[in-house]
Amino acid sequence: MKVTIFSSKDYNDKKTNFGDCILIDTGTSLVIYDCGHQKHAERVLAYMKKAGYKKADFILSHNDSDHFDGLPYLIEAGVISHVYTLLLLKEKYRKKLLQIMGNYIKDETLVKRIKTEYDNIYSLGNSVTLVDALELPSVCTGVSIIGPELDAALEAVAKHLDNREGNTLDGETIHNAICFQVKIKMDDGKHMLLCGDSAFSMVEPNLKYASYIQLPHHGKYEIAEKIFECKDSHKHIGTKYYVSDNTGTTNGGSDTLKTKDYGRDVTYTTDGDIPVGEKKSSPYVTGKSYGELIR
């Protein structure tokens, strides 16, 4: 199992927010977690060609542009089999949302609001197979969606769609707060947790599984501090942390996190691509054969 968190360090354009793009290569299947820009998408295609993958599955943590905008390019290239995403137009979710909102609005109004808020997801239309990520499915061997918990997610969405309510959870927008989280079983038997821009309350139940953690919202330090405290309280020693952040203090940002001395093992994409789980080559030369000894 190899996970690669893309960096934009070597891109010529230093002003553009290229967003997140994370590849999960099981050795037999490829899963893409977010793709925020066409530049990242082009690198995904190059990786697939080199590794011999013709198709990949895609998990969309949420529909913000810095996580979504490279996806249409990949779909047009014909390499995406399924997109795991938030599909709130399903009747079972609409009924629950209306119930949470006290039937304050009619179903037709709710449908319009969902289509407006998640227009980029539904713009994918019939071009790719969309899979309901709220059912927390297994994507392939060793890769599964494990959060957010359904009721908590729908409560948050209802708050967002009800214009009488606020649009934040734990200081994050609802779009960010309910990001889909991914659990990956690494070759050492430990697990990695990908969080997108999730709010702390949404990732907290899943921290116990993880020895490798992508810090949410590009390393936003307020969330990182809570995660550090949570792991410390459970005496989880040796956890490794990763920050996908190519824009500094914008979009959450890791600059403040860098200036604080937390004494944690944190790696940043500002220093380049981050490979996780990549096997190191042996320093020893083996396997040579010089033939039989001539007498």
Feature map (PLM): residue ranges:
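Binuclear metal-ion centers of metallo-dependent hydrolases, dominated by the metallo-beta-lactamase
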Residues: 81-146, 235-295
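Core dinuclear metal-dependent hydrolase active-site scaffold
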Residues: 1-53, 123-209, 220, 279-295
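C-terminal or late-domain output modules
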Residues: 191, 203, 208-212, 221-233, ...
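Metal-dependent catalytic neighborhoods of phosphoester/phosphodiester hydrolases
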Residues: 44, 68-80, 94-103, 225-230, ...
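Active-site environment of divalent metal-dependent phosphoester hydrolases
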Residues: 18, 38-40, 63-69, 90-93, ...
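Ser/Thr-centric signal marking residues that sit
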Residues: 26, 61, 198, 269-270
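Active-site metal-binding motif and surrounding structural segment of the metallo-beta-lactamase
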Residues: 39-90, 207-220, 234-239
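Structural beta-sheet core signal
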Residues: 58, 193-194, 241-243
